[in-house]
Amino acid sequence: MHLQKLKYLFLALFLWQCSPSEQYEVADNPLDGGRYFIENSMQGNFKKAKFYIVEDAENLALFEKMASNYFGLDKEGRMQIRLASIQINEITAVDSTMSILNYQNSFDKEVHKLRIISTPKGWKVDLKYTYGQN
């Protein structure tokens, strides 16, 4: 009897270890989708930031370039970005499935725009809009 309980305990622990440990919060609205992406990118948490982008070949290539640029900065440059605050200037709904987020951060004070799209997996950022011709 005791051995049986022990087997179930080990099975439960094994299954718990096999389950994905990094569950990220699904963005329920465009503001959250954009904010989660921006915050994690600025913190250098590109694994989590990647969860908040539309996953297609072009977006993934742009995302990898963005991450490479971040890690190409020296330690002080990355620290300045991590410490910068985010200012959301405006969010505009294009339609019920797409919004444009206009923001800047206190580090570069440059205005940036993100297109955020509703997907079955929550609101996700489309980097093609930001880095393409818009």
Region spans (language model):
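Exposed beta-sheet edge and beta->alpha loop/turn motif
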Residues: L83-N134
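Bacterial signal peptide processing site
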Residues: S19-E22
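Short solvent-exposed beta->alpha transition segments
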Residues: V26, L31-D32, Y36, S41-V94
